[in-house]
Amino acid sequence: MKNLFLLVSLLFLLSCGKQELDWLILSPNNVNGLTNLKFLLSGFTTTIFISIVSISLSIVLGLIVAIPSLAKNKFLTYLNIGYVEIVRAIPLLVLILWIYYGLPIMTGISFSPFVSGIIALSISESAFQAEIFRAGINSIRKPQWEAGSSLGLNFFRKLRLVILPQAIRNILPAIGNQFVYVLKMSSLVSIIGIGDLTRKAN
């Protein structure tokens, strides 16, 4: 029964899509193929650049958002929770379209498609990065904070010199996963005319 199911699934998959795909259009052995390949690679470099810039900005913004959640002030804690929950609830495509089309109408401030895409990706990802940083910082045991206090360090110096170096080792895998997520979701910026890999492939 299992083999029959696999056979039916294989036949179904083989029937999907176009059978006349010509992969020789990307062959570097002919002039047209080489041109097409360079065209696709230019989109690939754009995708990688957008992803790296977006993840870098989101890490900085995420850390800024995460720090107030460590405070005992309830207002700051609720502000942090509100930002994270609202931003994570907004679909990325909606955010991209709103920043590129909606923001100029409402405020008169407009950005190029490239900048709009990076802003949208950075804001959307910053909410996830904030939670990653918060979890990483909270994973450091209380004696480490007390050790920083015994050295006469203030809150931010304790965070920078004692806590964050240890927390970063714990959260690196999660940040790596989020980079892969941003790399995949960056394909949505093609909707506002950015020549990334998705748009060039189409």
Report the location of each language-model feature.
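Transmembrane alpha-helices and adjacent helix-loop boundaries
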Residues: 2-4, 14-202
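Bacterial N-terminal signal peptides
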Residues: 8-11
